[in-house]
Curated annotation (Swiss-Prot):
Belongs to the peptidase C65 family. This is Ubiquitin thioesterase otubain-like. InterPro entries: OTU_dom, Otubain, Papain-like_cys_pep_sf, Peptidase_C65_otubain, Peptidase_C65_otubain_sub1, Peptidase_C65_otubain_sub2. Hydrolase that can remove conjugated ubiquitin from proteins and plays an important regulatory role at the level of protein turnover by preventing degradation. Specifically cleaves 'Lys-48'-linked polyubiquitin. The active site is at D85, C88 (nucleophile), H245, H267. It comes from the Eukaryota. One of its GO terms (cellular component) is plasma membrane. One of its GO terms (molecular function) is cysteine-type deubiquitinase activity.
Length: 284
């Protein structure tokens, strides 16, 4: 999560970090990978049958993943792929919430009010004014146009697939994640690497685009957005509780999650249950 503290030389001076040629080559390769991903995968794909996921694996090279995907297909009927560009968790939550609000006007109105509250909170926490006028106002206007009917469902998905507009909207989610952590810094400080403050962590790991979300960011965004999320894991060793799925918040298992994400190593997509009459529950 944090870089190691700089080592001091014999004179007590901090040694300067040296970027090697190999590191530069690796960075270039990583950038090219992101660019290739961007060209081949939309930011937010159309709904697809869950069977497409199963078809990605075979018994010879990925038997465990094939088995898990097949098991999940008994409960989940559709998947919406999200571009893997370092923003996939934030974007998946954004898409999940927008889908809810497209069908639930009261929820949309509540989220607009909440977004205005977060804008004020950002100002109170000392975020630059331009942050609020640019990203927050843009997102709230987007929601208001959904509410007024200016943005149809088709228009919404067009916007969510436009890099410029979609990333402006996405930035709002990074900002409220950062604000939530700063508001609750005493609670979360023990989970941050030694030598780094909550503010430094947010500035380095949350606020910049293309930074993957770790467990701290995941919990914070879900709580800041006021939603309930289930994450299904293809590999149970990645789950915080060692199970096949994990609910956030985890305080009341009787309340169904609103959004379900599928986690594969380093990536999140949105998945959707079959009708209750078709699906059978997966055991932990």
């Amino acid at each position: 999560m944090a870089n190691e503290p700089q080592k001091s030389d014999d004179n007590g001076q901090a040694a300067e970090a040296v970027v090697t040629d190999d590191e530069i080559v690796l960075q270039d390769q990583q950038l090219k990978t992101i660019e290739d991903e961007q060209k081949s995968v939309p930011l937010v794909a159309t709904l697809a049958p869950f069977s497409i996921l199963c078809a990605e694996y075979d018994n010879e090279t990925s038997a465990a993943f094939l088995s898990k995907a097949t098991e999940l297909s008994e409960v989940y009927g559709e998947i919406r792929y999200i571009r893997g560009d370092g923003n996939c968790f934030y974007r998946a939550i954004l898409v999940g919430l927008i889908e809810i609000m497209l069908k639930d006007r009261a929820r949309l109105e509540k989220f607009i009010a909440s977004s205005r509250d977060w804008t004020r909170t950002l100002v109170e926490l000392g975020f630059p004014d331009w942050t609020c006028t640019d990203f927050c106002d843009f997102f709230i206007e987007f929601l208001e146009k959904i509410h007024s009917g200016v943005h149809t469902e088709e228009a919404v998905y067009t916007i969510l697939n436009d890099d410029g507009s979609a990333n402006y909207i996405l930035m709002f989610f990074r900002l409220i994640t950062s604000a939530f952590l700063k508001q609750n810094s005493e609670e979360y400080a023990p989970f941050i690497d030694e030598g780094m403050t909550v503010a430094q962590y947010c500035e380095q790991e949350i606020e910049p685009m293309w930074k993957d979300a770790d467990h701290l960011a995941i919990n914070s965004l879900i709580k800041a957005a006021g939603t309930r999320v289930r994450i299904e894991y293809m590999d149970r060793t990645a789950a915080p509780n060692g199970g096949w799925h994990y609910d956030i918040p985890s305080d009341d298992q009787q309340i169904a999650p609103e959004i379900t994400l599928l986690y594969r190593p380093g990536h999140y997509d949105v998945i959707y249950k079959k009708d209750s009459t078709e699906a059978s529950e997966i055991e932990n």
